[in-house]
């Protein structure tokens, strides 16, 4: 994951324009809002990126923790949201002191593809510990093995046409093809998971998971999973 952290901490070309970046984060924020369980909830956004519209998510909950591994991005988050008393910015290492069962909702959106399977397992273990019984982990934008880059390009162009940055998207795709992003994608690769594989991975971490009907974000070819921490208090005792 370190190489990808360095990439996103640089002046990268993953977004074809400012409008693309804004639309991307607005779509994700709106989708996250649908999962916030109550105004009293504590929400964690793991590897949140720029999280431009996090203030809207924070307004719907009691506390929003933005956890980001890239130091430069984390600095911008602190500058952007520092005055907001409902938002707390942390590094990933700073999540370790969080008490057991202190979070109602955790989201990991478009993150798993940049992590090794072992790194993802460690993140799941952390989430399982800090989520309350009945709390949920929303794992979004999971790449499927059978879906290639052409599908991602088509999803981007559809989003661009809908939101008025199609020309920028076409030029941006040409630039990105020659950028460090594609070099990294070809040399390191992106992690992909089938539905059954991810369900098994989440079950092994102690969750009760299922695939959501729709993906978080704008790419319907990718998958979102909702993994619930079992509430043992609600489990009916077995009868003889």
What do the PLM-derived regions correspond to, one by one?
Residues 42, 63, 102-104:
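Structural signature of beta-strand start/N-cap positions in the alpha/beta core
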Residues 46:
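Conserved beta-strand/loop positions that form the S-adenosyl-L-methionine
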Residues 110-111:
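Short catalytic micro-motifs in class I SAM-dependent methyltransferases
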Residues 1-40, 49-85, 89-97, 138-240:
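Class I (Rossmann-like) S-adenosyl-L-methionine-dependent methyltransferase catalytic domain
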Residues 107:
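A conserved beta-strand element that flanks and buttresses the S-adenosyl-L-methionine
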Residues 121-133:
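A short glycine-rich, Lys/Arg-flanked "PGG" loop and its adjoining helix->strand segment in the class I
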Residues 116-117:
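Helix-capping/helix-break motifs at membrane-protein junctions
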